[in-house]
Swiss-Prot record:
Keyword tags: Lyase
Lineage: Bacteria, Pseudomonadati, Pseudomonadota, Alphaproteobacteria, Rhodobacterales
Pfam families: D-Glu_cyclase
Protein name: Putative hydro-lyase Dshi_0610
One GO BP annotation of this record: glutamate metabolic process
Top EC group: lyase
Native source organism of the sequence: Dinoroseobacter shibae (strain DSM 16493 / NCIMB 14021 / DFL 12)
Family membership: Belongs to the D-glutamate cyclase family.
Length: 260
């Protein structure tokens, strides 16, 4: 399996979000931070596997990531990167060529885009793909488990699902523990401390019309919130919705011949 998406991103042919691209290929979130904080962040991922399912990490300074894809370069193959300084988003850039240093470690985390394709195959509509928008994301009233300087609230993504298909969506997504797994909650958003679904903290609004039930999954923005709390001098992530598309099969990236 080989995806042409990274090459298209690198050449500037594709600059938007990656929802619905390269069906069958695993999409991952990126977190890039100084090596001095890598162990603590790895522990944070282990303590919070739903929002931070760790797929793989690099050695310090490593830019080529052949384990994830042929010719893949972590500095250039994501449509947009967010750069944080002292916990504050300072800028968004199309590549990291001017911001890279040899002490940086990159983490790849699984993401819920992976199971969206499975939902579609099962006849369950995915609104953000149908409307070509970024899935809405919300900060909740639940806290993650801390490790070192890393702590913060759980962030969730929301997809409206027809009421008759909510249970099926739950069962399908539960088959992908490396990509958020089963939903955190379905139904009343106030249970999660979300007052207004029309005011997402990240992404685009998605109406819960036509009998749609709001279904919430743990989201890859959770570690971004933890990074902001940590106030590191420098850390880098993907821009929400703008993922790294790998060559790994999304249905089982850990099978023999892929990751061990």
């Amino acid at each position: 399996m080989h995806s042409s998406v990274p090459a298209e991103i690198r050449s500037g042919q594709h600059q938007g979000h990656t929802a619905g691209l390269a069906p069958g290929c695993l999409q991952v979130n990126l977190v890039v931070l100084p090596a001095s904080h890598a162990q603590a962040f790895g522990e944070y991922c282990a303590l919070n596997p739903r929002p931070c399912p760790l797929i793989l990490l690099t050695t310090p300074g490593q830019t080529d990531w052949t384990e994830l894809g042929t010719g893949l370069d972590v500095r250039r193959d994501v449509p947009a990167y967010n750069i944080y300084e002292n916990g504050v988003l300072s800028r968004t850039v199309p590549d990291l060529l001017n911001d890279w240093s040899d002490d940086l470690v990159t983490f790849a985390l699984g993401f819920s885009f992976t199971f969206e394709h499975a939902l579609l195959r099962a006849g369950i509509p995915v609104r953000n793909i149908a409307t070509n928008t970024t899935v809405p994301m919300y900060q909740t009233n639940r806290e993650t488990r801390s490790a070192g300087p890393f702590a913060g609230p759980l962030v969730v993504s929301m997809r409206p699902i027809p009421a008759a298909k909510v249970a099926k969506a739950h069962d399908i997504s539960a088959q992908f523990p490396w990509a958020r797994g089963a939903p955190i909650h379905s139904g009343d958003p106030k249970v999660l401390g979300i007052e207004d679904l029309d005011q997402p903290d990240w992404g685009d609004t998605s109406e819960t019309r036509d009998g749609g039930v709001p279904v919430f999954w743990a989201c890859g923005v959770t570690p971004q919130a933890a990074l902001e709390e940590a106030e590191l001098s420098l850390c880098i992530t993907h821009r929400p919705g703008h993922m790294l598309v790998t060559d790994l099969p999304e249905h089982d990236p850990f099978r023999a011949g892929n990751l061990q």
